[in-house]
Amino acid sequence: MKSDIVVIGGGASGLMAAYSAASSLVKAGKAAQVTVLEKMPRPARKVMITGKGRCNFTNVKEWNDFSSHVRSGVSFVKSSFYNLPPSAVVRFFEDMGMKTVVERGDRAFPVSYHASDVVDALVNACHGAGVKIECEAVVEEVKSIGNGFEVLLQDGGKYLCSKVIIATGGLSYPTTGSTGDGFAWASALGHHIVPTFPSLTALVPKGYKIKETEDIRQSRADADDRFHVDRSTPLSELGEKLCGIQMKNVGLSLYVQDNLVDTDQGDVDFTDGGIEGPLGFRMSRKAVKSIVNGSKVFLVMDLKPGVTLTEITERVKTLWKEVDKDPRSARLREKEKCRILLGKLMPWDLIPAFVEMHREIYTLERRSRTETKLWINLVSIAKALKVWRFDIAGYVGYERAVVTAGGVSTDDVVAKTMESRLVSGLYFCGEVLDVDSDTGGYNLQTAFCTGALAGLNAAKSLK
């Protein structure tokens, strides 16, 4: 089979690349075929689950603000960003009949909050431009031959083409088809692959999962994934107490080898995986990379980031006096009164885990052989509110990581065209590249803009 341009991978970046190539060929009056080879039964499976199915498809920030959320390859992305900025991405979808809405944090969604609308728009745009989408087309190998390429399929078929765009994504959510195939092909063609690791993933605190987690890690002592904790691993009693709690506007600081490396304020979720949410995800990139490199990592959560330790200490003491003097507290034990106090300082469902992890808030005084007195340490409560430490035992792997960090080195790719510096006619776009960003629409924007630039230049270079 022959096709002038073959796009391998029918995800967000691949579909945008195919549309960009085909539509530019139509505008130029060139008769050429663009074909997408997608290994799964349907295209854009990962897009379908983005944002829990709501699909935050871009972030409408201008470059200066947007770029601060790109964690790798920021200078590389700039040209593609200006070629297809977020405003153009929004316009593309609206032109395809999908109404959009922009929410807090400049995050753009389909007004329906259905990811299927995003997928339908991409697929319909491709079909309208004459793109051929072949599903269940599993590529085995990409060969550079003469002035073109030979793309070999698992079923024995092959495509001969002038240009190839590799848009196979990374390793995240492999059930959607992202299994790292593009890394092997790129490497075989001479490209350097920056070591990969999961990013925007759950960090698993020590004691959050069952004790068998430690045994599992020991059995993987020689493996690259020895700190990977499968999300399905059962929760411990502590994990059960924390799971499902969502914290709004807390402080979170990341320490590596006892050195502060990052700090921010925002929302944190405790899930069946561990510590997630927008802020937890943002910290995960540096955390996972450090863990993989053998460093000790811990997080410190500040439940009261708006006040100083001195201020919260005085607040705790004042509240305790109110609780202690309340007639309804007269017959209550100290621990019961402490629970009432904590309920004035944090969500009620957080109290059991907070107490379990901060036993120092109770001081037991032995007055005689038979008499003891329990004291509530108010200073310790205040300190724990400001410094709640979570030692990180591991992380959830690619099976539920939002993106893959690492990939095809951007040193081997021309930023203004997305073409390989090593193999003429070969292009890369999307997550297969060593480019990743924060959660909030940044990664899909990068997928779209790098895909659009790759498709445009692949079409332009056709003779």
Please state what every model-predicted region is.
Residues 1-13, 35:
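Beta1/beta-strand and adjacent pyrophosphate-binding region of the FAD-binding site
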Residues 6, 22-52:
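Glycine-rich FAD pyrophosphate-binding loop
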Residues 6-8, 37, 139, 158-175, ...:
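Short hydrophobic core segments
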Residues 23, 42, 63-65, 73, ...:
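Residue-level recognition of phosphate/Mg2+-coordinating polar/acidic sites
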Residues 39-71:
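Conserved N-terminal glycine-rich FAD pyrophosphate-binding loop of Rossmann-like flavoproteins
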Residues 77-87, 104-124, 173-177, 205-208, ...:
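Short beta-strand to alpha-helix junction loop
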Residues 135-148:
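A conserved short coil-to-beta-strand element within the FAD-binding core of flavoproteins
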Residues 163-215, 228-229:
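Glycine-rich loop(s) and the adjacent beta-strand/alpha-helix scaffold that form part
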